[in-house]
Amino acid sequence: MGISKDRIKFNVGGRLFETTATTLANAGRDSFFGALFDDEWNLSPLEDSILFVDRNSDCFAVLLDLLRTGDLNVPANIPERLLHREASFYGLLDHVRTAKWGPFDGNRLRLSDSVKGIAPGDGTAIRAGPDGGCCVAHGSVVHVFDWMLEEHSPINLDYQRVNDVGWIDSDNIVLSACEKLGRGDGGMGLFSSSSGDLRYKFQVCHENQVKSYTAGALSFSPDYEIFASCKGRSNEYGIGVWDQITGKQTDFFYESPGWSLGDADKLQWLNGKNCLLVATLFPRKDNCYISLLDFRDKNMVWSWSDIGSPMAIDEKRVRDAIAMEDSNSICVVNEFEDLGFIDLRMYGGSVRWSSRSKLMKSKMPDEPCYPKLALHEGQLFSSMNDSISVFCGPDWVLTSRLRRSYGGSICDFSIGGDRLFALHSEENVFDVWETPPCPII
């Protein structure tokens, strides 16, 4: 290898390159180039004047420029899959991923890709992974994609319908499923995101007996807890809690008469309040039930329901809910994308609606999907038909809207790994939205 002070030469696939130690050090210790340095980050002397690497030279040029400038410039003649393969060889996949898109900002998102699957439409859920990948549930099958949008082995539950799915980390996925009649099966399982293999099955115990159950909505806490809404054959209706590390059940909050927990559509862990939001919504139930559960003393510390509330002509039914701890409120949305707010400081208070329905009613498609809500770093997102609206500021002003014309209404969306994934209902296709990387000055 040729070393002149801090310069180094490579022959990559017959093409000569010369660069500096400073550029190569940007690759990091765990990369291919990290082995060329000693413990003090000085280049180690080798016998050869030029280091030969039998790899693709065009990709090497792109990756070397990435290390030099921090910018990823890929010529049109280089397939993305090839670049990812070469980056993996050099240990630079994280560098490529960082350069492809910037920190998440709902007002700067651009459509990066659309991925069409082989399953039929009417997907159950899409969930963003922590590293920029995602998983999509269709019936009894969950399709898993890494951040390069390469599909891994699917997870197949053998005709048991998947109700919800969530990422423990980049290697592990939790699935909740319906109980299968005649088999006493169902519940929750931990699966490998790469192989699709079942690693662990979570059990529910009632009076020291293992029970068959249907698991629904999922949520996770920073203290390595898994929460799931549960329905059993006898009294196992409520919210179960499991330890992510051991897989053992640690608690169960039984629903009380006249209130719904086991049929919950949505669970959300509130770290600041150390409580779990549980929302059971129309049309799963005739009425809506939203509550905060404190598992430390098995207490429902706050609740709201539309039971007994007068319905307007347009029947503003709550279709989704999300807690916003910073403002001590819960945001709800109806089928017309009207946003409503409930004050968490008042027990059983009314909904303060912020009407936008006059703008939305004329745009309803033949088969609309119920709107969904998400909150990410101070920005509020609401899906409606084929678009996702972004709201910002203390008054939640509409600041941008994401829309594309293919695939029909959005049935679900998810934010994670600095990406937004939107699943369409009429075609089995999901969109990937990214924030462009910040310009290098």
From Swiss-Prot:
PROSITE patterns with a match to the protein in the record: BTB
CDD domains: BTB_POZ_KCTD-like (cd18316)
Pathway assigned to this chain's UniProt record: Protein modification; protein ubiquitination
Keywords: Ubl conjugation pathway
Gene3D superfamilies, per the entry: Potassium Channel Kv1.1, Chain A (3.30.710.10), YVTN repeat-like/Quinoprotein amine dehydrogenase (2.130.10.10)
A UniProt-annotated Pfam family: BTB_2
Gene Ontology annotations of biological process type: protein homooligomerization; protein ubiquitination
Annotated S-S bridges: none
Residue ranges of domain BTB in the record: 6-76
Domain notes: The BTB/POZ domain mediates the interaction with some component of ubiquitin ligase complexes.
PANTHER family: OSJNBA0029H02.24 PROTEIN, POTASSIUM CHANNEL TETRAMERIZATION DOMAIN-CONTAINING
Function, in words: May act as a substrate-specific adapter of an E3 ubiquitin-protein ligase complex (CUL3-RBX1-BTB) which mediates the ubiquitination and subsequent proteasomal degradation of target proteins.
Protein name, as recorded: BTB/POZ domain-containing protein At2g24240
Lineage summary: Eukaryota, Viridiplantae, Streptophyta, Embryophyta, Tracheophyta
